[in-house]
C-alpha cells in the first residue's frame, strides 16, 4: 500500500518512518520481510486534523512552564515539538535506572539550544511534556539531557504539532516512569 498522492510529503515521510502505511508482509526500508518483532507499538494520531503552532518565547520566560500553560489553555492532548534558540540557565536530567530517579544538573550561564525535541501526552488527564535538549556552550562543548527548566535569553522558537487523539502515559512498574501507552 502506497501513501503516495494521499498525503502531503511531510506527512507521508512521518507515517512511513513510524512504520504505518506499509502493507502486511511487505518489508519497508530497514526491515526484513521475515518478521515484525522490531516494530514499535504505534497508534495513528491524525489523518489530517493536526494543528501546527509556532511558539516564540522571549527573554526571561521559562520554557517548560510556558509549554504547560499553552497546552492547558488550548486543551491539547497529544503532540510533538522541535525547537532552537538560546537560554541563560537550565536544569537538565539524566535518568539513573539503578536509582530509578533523575540526576539533575544546573547549567548556569548562556547557552545555545542546538536541538530541542519532545512530545506531549496526558498523565492522569493532565498535559505532560517530555522534552530533551542539547545545549552548546561558548567553548564549543555541549551538554544535554531531559529538560526540567530553561530560562530564555533572548529567544526560544518552537514548532508544536498537536493531534486531536489523546495519547496517555502509564507508570511503568520497572522504572516508575510514566511511559507512552499508545
What are these regions (language model features)?
Residues 2-21:
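N-terminal secretory signal peptides and thylakoid transit peptides that target proteins
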Residues 16-17, 26-27, 32:
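Cleavable N-terminal signal peptides
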Residues 21-22, 74:
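Generic hydrophobic alpha-helical segments
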Residues 24-25, 77:
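Generic macromolecular interface patches on structured domains
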Residues 30-74, 78-82, 88-129, 134-182:
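N-terminal intrinsically disordered, cationic/polar leader segments
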Amino acid at each position: 500500500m502506497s501513501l503516495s498522492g494521499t498525503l502531503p510529503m511531510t506527512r507521508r515521510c512521518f507515517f512511513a518512518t513510524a512504520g504505518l502505511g506499509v502493507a502486511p508482509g511487505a518489508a519497508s526500508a530497514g526491515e526484513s520481510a521475515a518478521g515484525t518483532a522490531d516494530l514499535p507499538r504505534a497508534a495513528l494520531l491524525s489523518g489530517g486534523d493536526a494543528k501546527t503552532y509556532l511558539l516564540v518565547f522571549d527573554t526571561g520566560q521559562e520554557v517548560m512552564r510556558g509549554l504547560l500553560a499553552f497546552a492547558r489553555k488550548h486543551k491539547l492532548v497529544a503532540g510533538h515539538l522541535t525547537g532552537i534558540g538560546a537560554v541563560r540557565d537550565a536544569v537538565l536530567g539524566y535518568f539513573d535506572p539503578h536509582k530509578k530517579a533523575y540526576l539533575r544538573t544546573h547549567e548556569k550561564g548562556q547557552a545555545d539550544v542546538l536541538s530541542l525535541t519532545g512530545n506531549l501526552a496526558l498523565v492522569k488527564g493532565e498535559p505532560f511534556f517530555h522534552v530533551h535538549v542539547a545545549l552548546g556552550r561558548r567553548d564549543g562543548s555541549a551538554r544535554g539531557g531531559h529538560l526540567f527548566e530553561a530560562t530564555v535569553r533572548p529567544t526560544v522558537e518552537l514548532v508544536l504539532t498537536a493531534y486531536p487523539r489523546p495519547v496517555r502515559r502509564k507508570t511503568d512498574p520497572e522504572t516508575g516512569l510514566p511511559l507512552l501507552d499508545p
